[in-house]
Amino acid sequence: MSHSVSLTFPDGSVREFAPGTTGRDVAESISKSLAKKSVAIAIDGELRDLSDPVTEGRIEIVTREDKRALELIRHDAAHVMAEAVQELWPGTQVTIGPVIDNGFYYDFAKNEPFTPDDLPVIEKRMREIIARNKPFTKEVWSRDKAKEVFAVKGESYKVELVDAIPEGQDLKIYYQGDWFDLCRGPHMASTGQIGTAFKLMKVAGAYWRGDSNNPMLTRIYGTAWHTQEELDQYLHVLAEAEKRDHRRLGREMDLFHFQEEGPGVVFWHGKGWRIFQSLVAYMRRRLEGDYQEVNAPQVLDKSLWETSGHWGWYRDNMFKVTVAGDDTDDDRVFALKPMNCPGHIQIFKHGLKSYRELPVRLAEFGAVHRYEPSGALHGLMRVRGFTQDDAHIFCTDEQMAAECLKINDLILSVYEDFGFKEIVVKLSTRPEKRVGSDELWDRAEAVMTEVLKTIEAQSEGRIKTGILPGEGAFYGPKFEYTLKDAIGREWQCGTTQVDFNLPERFGAFYIDSESEKRQPVMIHRAICGSMERFLGILLENFAGHMPLWISPLQVVVATITSEADDYGREVAERLRDAGLTVETDFRNEKINYKVREHSVTKVPVIVVCGKREAEERSVNIRRLGSQAQTAMSLDEAVASLSAEATAPDLKRKAERTARA
């Protein structure tokens, strides 16, 4: 006799159902309207088809409005896109089509690659298929049957996928009407539930299975959302992001470029290097007093990287150099450092340390190199050579909480100086594969959980916090700091990571109050992370309209007539003496032409001088993005612009001095 199936509902109630009861049956037992709105079920958090028999556990009925339904909407849209393509271009082979962030894609094998002009045609056919409202149904096939059917259809890529599935394992085949595909599922009840809030975005080339030795396929990307409003908002953000693309701004503002001879490394132009150095100078000032700035070697012997563990698990991403030995020595293998931490441990170990000297805080604007795949490179955001605003704190167990809070205060203060208000701090806890005892992890996670509570309490609701279970590094738990930019995108930047691994590997120790050797806690800390990436984020956040204090070129003095050139030189000199970065434009061009030209390069302030201004010893100030003009005396302009161009930390320092 079959036992009933026990299901626990979100309200805590428990009900018994007969074996073979489907998710749809359960929904109908609650209400007809719920069954009509439902698109899937979740058993213990795992999404399943409505047609699946339920199994014992916690059940949730998933409706189309549920956030989890978005993955199903996108998955189903991918299948409908594949059907549309094969209806329009018979003989096209369908390969794989997963859901990705904000959308989906499918890879197709076609004699002539798709072009952007094909996308509206495919979209139109997709809408027709959705309107047919065909049910998604599932069959289970044997491996042999699947190979035979796909071979007859000429789907050689599907045959290869089936071959990769273990012997004896049954395969799921999903139908929508007569069209079918190999798929793990789940899917919604019918194509009609996808809705019409979708759009095909672009075509691209993609090698089969990501291997350049395999044939090139055509990948079609799409996006799909619950509602048209959500789709419109997403497309608006994409359009804004394109206008704000830091690579485009880098060209327009003459900041940097990349070229084939140095893939993934930045060629900084004069203005770009100026803004980069301004960022470094600001960060360096924020470290004064609390940190020792150090500098570790760029190139270190393989043996050090073997000790650190990088050689074992990161070697393929390291730039390696082999140096020929002489007659008595073998060749030596060196590597460019991908991280600063092993070098900082060597500095900490140089000389005996007492507990009275702790915490020791070592900081470095360290140039690191990592061999990223060429396809992953993306302007300043993903490079092979970059600068980390790295620091490592060596402290006692008892000092760890205070150090984490101190780091948190610094990170939040830096983000606020750059105008970022929406910050999320999350604690990543122990992963399955890790070093260190459970007792060590218990203690560290308990301390960091209390720190997280303190961060939330002190922020009075301004800072959101959360937990990322199992997302910690193998060597210790960590805090991740994510900031939101002007168009709502999230960027993970800062980290605070506790490390049990490296101090042990390198035998780092201090002498405690009992004259015993103790292993220090090592805390990795980064605020910007990659300085290059953070600069890219700033450029996109401000759309190139950088705050005056961090702008690469702060003022252009432009004259209306040659009669004002001498006065223009005096104005420029006064502004330079006040600490501003100034260029002059005395060309024989109309002033509106000059203003437009400098606006394209995102100069924040244009100081206009004509004959009248020279006579009155005044200036006319025009701001980037504004039609307004402000007239003021030269003395007022120098004082006002000088104050505005002062970095936030220097303003605070001046205010403290004035109060003292």
UniProtKB/Swiss-Prot annotation:
PROSITE patterns: AA_TRNA_LIGASE_II, TGS. Keywords: Aminoacyl-tRNA synthetase, ATP-binding, Cytoplasm, Ligase, Metal-binding, Nucleotide-binding, Protein biosynthesis, RNA-binding, tRNA-binding, Zinc. It holds the Pfam family HGTP_anticodon. Binds 1 zinc ion per subunit. Its main location: cytoplasm. Homodimer. The lineage of its organism: Bacteria, Pseudomonadati, Pseudomonadota, Alphaproteobacteria, Hyphomicrobiales. The gene is thrS. InterPro entries: aa-tRNA-synt_IIb (IPR002314), aa-tRNA-synth_II (IPR006195), aa-tRNA-synth_II/BPL/LPL (IPR045864), Anticodon-bd (IPR004154), Anticodon-bd_dom_sf (IPR036621), Beta-grasp_dom_sf (IPR012675), TGS (IPR004095), TGS-like (IPR012676). SUPFAM superfamilies: Class II aaRS ABD-related (SSF52954), Class II aaRS and biotin synthetases (SSF55681), TGS-like (SSF81271), ThrRS/AlaRS common domain (SSF55186). It catalyses: tRNA(Thr) + L-threonine + ATP = L-threonyl-tRNA(Thr) + AMP + diphosphate + H(+). Its cofactor is Zn(2+). It is an enzyme of class 6 (ligase). Belongs to the class-II aminoacyl-tRNA synthetase family. GO terms for biological process: threonyl-tRNA aminoacylation. Residues 245-547 are annotated as: Catalytic. This is Threonine--tRNA ligase. The keyword RNA-binding applies.
